[in-house]
Amino acid sequence: MSGRLPAGAGARRRRPTRHLDLRDDLAVVADLIADGSRVLDLGCADGQLVRHLERRHGCTGTGVEIDPEAVVEAIGAGVSVIELDIDAQLHEFGDDSYDVVVLSKVLQATRRPAEVLAQMSRIAPRCIVSVPNFGLWSHRWRLLRGRMPMSPQMPYDWHDTPNIHNATLVDLEEFLAEQGFTVEQRILFDAAGRVASWPDPLANLLSGAAVYLLARGGDATP
């Protein structure tokens, strides 16, 4: 799979670098985005990714967040943030108004994942999605013992989890194909959140989470 991410005119792609100011999965996301890109970060929380991309890589970023406290924190850090419901209000963004849309550890918490992905593919030719993997071996073991899965990637108990659409990597990749996406790159993480590499037969068993670089139909890199 190709890791190239075309951006706006004059944008430069970077080699992977260390991002000490970002959590591990967001550092991987940042390395997939070319300098100078127009970036929309859905579920941006305190705006950490947008702030990093703007200050260090010349990107133009906008965050979307529904938590009012997180919105205030992001604005206080100098990030452009819009308070919107990802499930219901993405139609407010124009077609191809961004180069890339990021949805980091949020898809499983949306009410209508298919509609959210459809809106993302309308807004930008490339999407980056990160998700926890419900198929991790320790999750399966907990289920066999009659307990709901928990891990560093899924730290919530059954009664307070925001996750309502849990999926394994196999489930997710089938779903992405059905939605018309091409997976250009997949980065795997182990149960502790470190970047890892396994052959396909083991990825769904050993991965705690994954980041996907997606191209909408007709926009995949040859």
Over which residues does each language-model region extend?
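S-adenosyl-L-methionine-dependent methyltransferase catalytic module, highlighting the catalytic core
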Residues: 114-119, 126-220
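Conserved alpha-helix/loop element of class I SAM-dependent methyltransferases that forms part
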Residues: 19-36
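Class I SAM-dependent methyltransferase SAM/SAH-binding core
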Residues: 52-89
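Class I SAM-dependent methyltransferase "Motif I" SAM/SAH-binding loop
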Residues: 43-45
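Glycine-rich SAM-binding Motif I of class I
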Residues: 47-51
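A short SAM/SAH-binding and catalytic strip from SAM-dependent methyltransferases
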Residues: 100-111
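Class I SAM-dependent methyltransferase Rossmann-like catalytic core
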Residues: 7-22
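Short conserved loop adjoining the S-adenosyl-L-methionine
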Residues: 89-95
